[in-house]
Design a protein with these regions (language model features):
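Conserved active-site regions of diverse hydrolases
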Residues: 1-315
Length: 315
């Protein structure tokens, strides 16, 4: 079961284990949920949403509370449908699957982004982190209360390395990799508090498995040592247009824009397989695969166990 601001981690997980992609809860026509369900939504936050990028005024209404409510509806309704038998029994998960499932979380990044773009200072955004993490913990506890026992919880990534932050805050102090230093410091503070919360969850619910995954370190290595891992131009958007980082709020990937009285579609760079930043706010498929291949080994997990053990050790 996936809860996230983006569904890349859930998609890559399924692909790596040769499983069908998890069907989105809201895309139920012809969907099979026997392998789980995906509640992730691009742009989603933990707390009640606010615009993340003011120029577009966009945000996802599917913040974590909504994703949780969708999960609860799915849990109840799937069993009602399954009991009808026949083809319905083949499309819905068995009741005990909810206890055996791996609940994956990759969310929080957009809460920080929303703060940065709400005219809050770095310290003011940092001050919101304890409440954000506390709200996250509440939903994990709620899922435990209805049977969840295995949780795979990702840290947030180096938000200060992404083009939408670097473009939005051009005067931000940069580190040796060219990333916005203070924005990344807030991300690391979020991860510190998140790890604390995971440790507390372990104490509160010793019968469950809580795996904390240090996604930040793996993603940051793509910006600090790109050539070592076969990547290039990590700060430059692959699918974008304009400015120092090939990114502009007014020229998003796939949009039609006018340049020198000529219309053009904002398209991909020539070789996305060696690029890190896809559209200024998200990673390329190649970068996501690199991250997943490393974190699935358990080398960046606490406890340091591979993903296949996180899935099964409490069944």
């Amino acid at each position: 079961m996936g809860f996230a601001s983006i569904n890349v981690s859930v998609i890559t997980l399924a692909k790596s284990f040769n499983l069908p992609y998890l069907s989105a809860y809201l895309n139920s026509l012809g969907a099979s949920y026997t392998n789980g369900a995906n509640f992730a939504s691009a742009g989603a936050t933990i707390r009640f949403p606010s615009p993340i990028i003011p120029a577009s005024g966009g945000y996802s209404p599917f913040y974590l509370d909504v994703q949780y409510q969708q999960f609860m509806q799915f849990k109840d309704r799937s069993q009602i449908i399954r009991k009808q038998g026949g083809k319905f029994a083949k499309l819905m998960p068995k009741e005990d699957y909810f206890r055996k499932a791996l609940y994956t979380f990759d969310i929080g990044h957009n809460d920080l982004g929303a703060g940065f773009f709400s005219n809050m200072s770095i310290e003011e955004v940092k001050a919101t982190v304890p409440d954000i993490v506390n709200r996250f913990s509440i939903y994990v506890k709620n899922i435990y209360e209805v049977g969840g026992r295995s949780f795979w919880i990702h840290s947030t990534g180096p938000i200060g390395c992404l083009a939408y932050i670097l473009t939005g805050f051009p005067s931000a102090e940069k580190d040796s990799a060219g990333c916005a230093k203070q924005h990344n410091e807030v991300a690391r503070y979020f991860n510190y508090k998140l790890k604390e919360a995971v440790f507390q969850l372990r104490k509160d619910f010793p019968s469950a498995a809580f795996t904390y995954v240090d996604v930040y370190s793996v993603k940051y290595s793509l910006f600090s040592e790109p050539k070592k891992y076969g990547f290039e131009l990590p700060l430059i958007t692959c699918c974008g247009y304009g400015g120092k980082y090939n990114y502009s709020d007014a020229a998003g990937c796939g949009e039609t824009i006018t340049v020198n009285n000529t219309k053009m579609v904002v398209g991909s760079c020539d070789n996305p397989s060696v690029r890190v930043d896809w559209d200024g706010a998200h990673y390329t498929e190649a970068a996501n695969k690199f991250v997943f291949d490393r974190i699935s080994t358990g080398a960046f997990s606490d406890p340091p166990i591979p993903l296949n053990m996180a899935c099964h050790r409490n069944v």
